[in-house]
Amino acid sequence: MFDPVKRADMLRPLMLKNGKFLISRIAGTGEEVKEDEDRIAYSTYFKFKWYIDLPEQLSLSPAELWSPNLLGLVDNPLSSSLRDIKKLEFQNPPFSAAFRMKGKHGDPKDYNRAFTIQLSGCNYNCNYCFVPPETNACNPNFSKYFSVKEIVDYFLKAREDFNEPINVVRVTGGENMIVPEFVIELYNELEKIDGTYLWIDTNLSATKHMENVENELKDVLKRRNVGVTGCFKGTCKEDFSLITGAQQSFFDDQFKAAKLFLDWKTDLYVYLPALVYGNSVEQKIDGFVNMLQALNKNLPLRVEMLIIHEYPAAKRNMELKSKEKRPIPLTDQRKVFDSWYNKILPKYYSKEMLSKFCCEVPL
Ligand code: SF4
């Protein structure tokens, strides 16, 4: 098991060189969107995704989309297919962006398509990772350096070409907080473009690099058109280490990073992959909820549990890490979802709080 802080230090000079940032090539990874195939300029390095994608949801009016009936799990989750278990697979970005920009008058469909930039380089080595290992390793054959200005030009071109709104720019990875300068520079460019929302993913491991640019980063993170999703890996230190390949002692660093985001007035959301090892699922989830509550009493209500699909790259990672004795857990993910949403959260929160979208939950 490795030290992810040392790994981040090694990766940083490869991810940021001469004022340009290393961006993963999406083409050829199986992650590109089919419809984009003829838009080579974008789909080679950037990708687009719809977050509300079910036809019956896309046809709803904004008021209908804000109904609490769309929250939580479908009835009988344990006998449903995993793919369909959540009524809404993702609230972020469409709902979070709409809410931050226009409150509940906002239309989530205006923020449903995200122009996604994937930085190459991650200091974890997760066994479920959706990114192909070579794409995530600062490998020059699978990535290219771009200035922020060049990236924003691609975004503007995409906005002109698509006949539906693209108002969200998502920065994912890799771990982008190893080079937080990217987020700062990108926001400063996006600020000049009306109506954009910046969504930042992080694995909550790179506080040192965040603190090095504290003032500029804080200034970006507190803006209304910025949201951050911190992805916790596992509900306890043992599971964290099996999932990420990092030493168990770094489990607590995730909470320190989340605290830093909260202290800096970030609109913070949490992802939790539905991966729990062993039989004590409820006990582990309960313990994790308590750890989040110690940071902020409402933080568990801002969690979106992630379905771990066997996408082509994820399948390769699962097979590779299985050989390193880090297979993904055998626990049925539906059981993890059921425990989180139907058993543990109702133990701590009222019906009224449970019927809020994550973005409505005050921190
Ligand atoms: S899942 Fe995220 S944190 Fe984990 S290795 Fe992949 S990019 Fe890094």
Task: Give the role of each language-model region.
Residues Q57-N76, I166-E185, A206-K208, N212, ...:
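Short N-terminal secondary-structure initiator segments
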Residues F155-V168, G173-V303:
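Conserved AdoMet/S-adenosylmethionine-binding subsite of the radical SAM
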